[in-house]
Amino acid sequence: MKRSRPKKLDIRVEPGIDFEATHVLYRVSVRNRGQATARDVMITAKVLHGPFVLDEPAKAVPVLKPGTVGTAFFRITAKDEPGELEVGARVAYWDSDGEKGHEASAPPMRIDLRPPAMRPVYITPGALRERASRSLSAQDTLALPYDAERAFPVVAEALAREGLERIEEITYARGDEFVGQASFHGLDRRKNSYAVRVVASGRDASSTLKIHVFVQAEEFLFGFHWRVRAAIRSAVGMPAHQP
């Protein structure tokens, strides 16, 4: 009687990175290209280099059948000013009968997340809005430590010092209510476009600042947002590196 060949495991690990304003998402996909089922797949990620923190536990894929993919996401934050990030992952799994354990690893990924250096370039408000509509964006809101009317010019000057051109500025005040809006634009050395719009508003004792950032290149969203937020927090007297 002819014996059938044992089914083989063929596990491939495919890493990737996605960008958010306040986090980097490290993505690890485990693909089963073999004929046997893998069980108890554990994916452990680790920052190998750079001023970053990854404090999430290992992620599990209980069953990975042939031809299927299991994916885990890990959120990475910056300890201080972002720099170069190197991240990797280890994958442990068992064969279908649970008798033999296996390990695999994701090739390390290294990416430069330093905030871009910009130069101010004037464009018309209409052109700024048109560029912003075609850019990747992120929004943020901060509670201001003092009234919006005093904080607004401080914020505007701080952004100008970061190499951004002030395109437009509008203020409105009536009684205890104040609203200030300003838009900025700049280019980095590769001529990637960046923009920021801030809206400071206050009524009675409550004041907030809305921040809207736009980037032309996805990989610069994290660093640019960090720079804008840090500059604003420092200018108004808040710790620059806190979330």
Spans of features found by a protein language model:
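Short beta-strand and strand-turn-strand segments in soluble, beta-rich domains
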Residues: 9-10, 39, 48-60
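Short edge beta-strand/loop segments characteristic of extracellular beta-sandwich folds
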Residues: 27-33, 75
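Short proline/glycine- and polar residue-rich coil/turn motifs
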Residues: 61-70
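Structural beta-strand segments of beta-rich domains
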Residues: 22-26
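Short acidic, flexible loop segments centered on an aromatic residue
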Residues: 31-51, 90-92
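Acidic, serine/threonine- and proline-rich intrinsically disordered appendage/tail regions
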Residues: 1-20, 80-243
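A short interface-forming secondary-structure element
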Residues: 31-33, 60-62, 214, 218
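Short, hydrophobic beta-strand segments
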Residues: 70-80
